[in-house]
Amino acid sequence: MLDVIVVGAGPAGLTAALYAARAGKSVLVLEENAAGGQINYSPLVENYPGLPALPGAQLGETLAQQAQDLGAQLDWRQVTGLTPLDPGFRLDTDCGPLECRAVVIATGVTHRP
């Protein structure tokens, strides 16, 4: 059983994964699209603390790489359900179920024009 599954690989999800991995937890990040989430659609991110201005897609790649460097795993799946267990949780995905001790929901937002 994994320690933590993070649903969503945007900046919030990847940051959660990074900190959980740094704490020595086994971490899996599930994302159905590209790592970085909505930040990928930003041509230039100029206000991310500690980093110079860079394209949004590059920031997403950087965050994903940092989390992976610390031991987090990324997998491309769609989560279709979440069930509490005793202990932990079961996540149903398009590739089958997964179990974990803790889950972080960081699914972000939907772009509105």
Spans of features found by a protein language model:
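Glycine-rich NAD(P) Rossmann-fold beta1-alpha1 loop
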Residues: G10
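FAD-binding core/adjacent interface of flavoenzyme oxidoreductases
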Residues: M1-V7, A23, L74-P113
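Alpha/beta-hydrolase active-site loop signature
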Residues: A34, P43-E46, H111
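N-terminal Rossmann-fold NAD(P) dinucleotide-binding loop
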Residues: G13-L14
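N-terminal Rossmann-like dinucleotide/flavin-binding domain of flavoprotein oxidoreductases
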Residues: N40-P97
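Glycine-rich FAD pyrophosphate-binding loop
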Residues: I5, A21-Y41
